[in-house]
């Protein structure tokens, strides 16, 4: 019988390089929300990949960027604090983007960490193969990566090869979670993230960064349905108006789309009730951030 390998692997990179898409591809389920808008992921999200020979806990981190408010500071600290707590690190970049200052900043942070770092070049389906080598060389000039994997998280190219390499590199260890468990986050957290994803998909650019979702209640099933009640938090009355929409149509569409994904995730029929609440400047209010589950003091 072969030895069982297990460990924790951080996925790090600039906003919007495809970290959440990659993790959802591996798990075969949507537990990390996805959007073309930056700053989609706000918390560290653990995804659990299990085979007979290994268990890899992937930590999908917020995209690292220059902070503009207390929430941004929390997200950067959440991402960087992960680096010393894992067995390996995946540094993800985009095949169709040149190396930028943000990538250089991340590599300088990685230089302080004594863990193997894998360069993951995502979105190779968007470029010609001949364009990859110069990009790889530009990154290797700045950092000694353990290995380089060009992949497509959307199409699945080279993802299996990466998983094999990670399995071989991780230490011999136990299975930390049951084989059918995909995340260690509670259901209400994932439900809130799925609601927020639909807001990102449907609303204008000025709204998404100012939105949070607070799941107030997930009641026992009544009449065969799970009762979920949640508040959508915004900073201004004008944003509340956008979320609700004319005649409540936008809020209705958010609810319909979110309910569909929540039902797929939980395997139950859902009755979803949504309200919109204005909390001015909540992204700079440490007490309110803490009530939503963000606490920068925990990351010092």
UniProtKB/Swiss-Prot annotation:
GO cellular component, one term: cytosol
UniProt record similarity statement: Belongs to the TRAFAC class TrmE-Era-EngA-EngB-Septin-like GTPase superfamily. Era GTPase family.
Residues that coordinate or bind GTP: 13-20, 60-64, 122-125
Keyword rRNA-binding: yes
Pfam families: KH_2 (PF07650), MMR_HSR1 (PF01926)
Record keyword Cytoplasm present: yes
Cellular localisation: Cytoplasm; Cell membrane
Any one Gene Ontology BP term: ribosomal small subunit assembly
Region annotation G5: where it falls in the sequence: 151-153
Disulphide bridges: none
Subunit annotation: Monomer.
Domain of life: Bacteria
Region (G3): 60-63
Keywords: Cell membrane, Cytoplasm, GTP-binding, Membrane, Nucleotide-binding, Ribosome biogenesis, RNA-binding, rRNA-binding
Location of region: G4: 122-125
Role summary: An essential GTPase that binds both GDP and GTP, with rapid nucleotide exchange. Plays a role in 16S rRNA processing and 30S ribosomal subunit biogenesis and possibly also in cell cycle regulation and energy metabolism.
Gene expressing this chain: era
Source organism (scientific name): Lacticaseibacillus casei (strain BL23) (Lactobacillus casei)
Principal subcellular localisation of the protein: cytoplasm
KH type-2 domain span: 203-280
Segments for region (G2): 39-43
Membrane topology value: Peripheral membrane protein
Stretch list, region G1: 13-20
Identification of the protein by name: GTPase Era
